[in-house]
Amino acid sequence: MAVVTRRFATGGMHCRSCSMLIEMEVGELSGVQSVTSDHAQGLTVVSYDEAATSPDQIVGAITKAGYAAELVQD
């Protein structure tokens, strides 16, 4: 199991409730260890097992919650 941490630029969040919705949706993905979303910074940080989940799946979960998302390349 290789756990990685990736950052996702997340647009459209206005308050802590928005962040919580994203955290719940992404947290349901297989392999996700932790997720923290910050509406003030427009950023979601996810630690996950890259054998179980992909950045595209995380972007999809954020989009499903109603927000725009893009992987931030380090």
Locate the predicted segments by residue:
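Flexible metal-binding regulatory segments at protein termini and peripheral loops
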Residues: 1-74
